[in-house]
Amino acid sequence: MRLPSVSVVLPTRSRLGLLPEAVRSVCAQTLPPTELLIIDDGSQGEVHSAIRPVIDHAHFPITVRPGPGRGPGPARNVGVTAARGDLIAFVDDDDLWQPEKLAWQTSWFAADASLGLVGTEAERTAVPRQAKLSGLPPRRLRRVPRSALVRANPLVTSSVVARRECFDICGGFDESLRLAQDWEMWLRIARHWQVAVVPAPLTIYRVHAEQRSRDRVEMRGCEAEVLRRGLARGSISGDRLRALARRRIAWAHCRQGRALLRAGRTGQAEKELREAISLFRLQPLAWTGLVRCRLTRFAVSRGDAA
């Protein structure tokens, strides 16, 4: 059984202290990739110098290419376009892989042509360590139904390996989205292929001070937009999935409205909560949030009158 070749795409931006460890974890794979493509998306510093000691001992080509400077999604697209492998694996510059990761995932792709994307479980930690794994991959993958992908993004991007064909047919990451580009991509892939997860912590998601905190309001807005695009593009199809997506959009508006309310942005909060109720009326949290908006406005008006 011929194993498919793997190209690794690693976007990076000004994390020269963390990048060498990520590259080293790729080089330590028991099944080495065909190539590693590092997309420098505007680092303040010399990427080549930071990883030179690792490159000198690698047994496969490591290439640094310039990125467009517009975030990880566009940078990943540069890597996908340049990749030569049958499979494309993604890893972020602040995450790590266990040595068995690519070997286990690649063996599943070779055995099952219906698979388009295979992720792994991820260990979230501030202190990376090498997990004690059995010598053989699990006997079964955990399939990810499309309904689970509509509810939320269950995949850490650094855990994902996908067939090259997925991008040839579905296109690349949607660069017009500010956030959640990966989730929108997985939804498109899941329309045509099976999605699964190796039930073992083969990816290490590092928690560290440099991680950029996201505005919760912006995150909720992007969640709703991803699902809207899925409905419009047909990546979310069928009556049950479409109904589920509409409920999830309503729930995203509800959470966004409540986050705005906590931030004191009452007018915007009321707009979001009304939108949530218009999409799905049976949302007690949206109704109670709307009542709080009105009470807040009433209290402010009474205070102004006094």
For the regions a protein language model found, what residue spans apply to each?
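Nucleotide-sugar donor-binding/catalytic module of glycosyltransferases
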Residues: M1-G221
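C-terminal subregions of glycosyltransferases and related glycan-biosynthesis enzymes
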Residues: L3, V207-A306
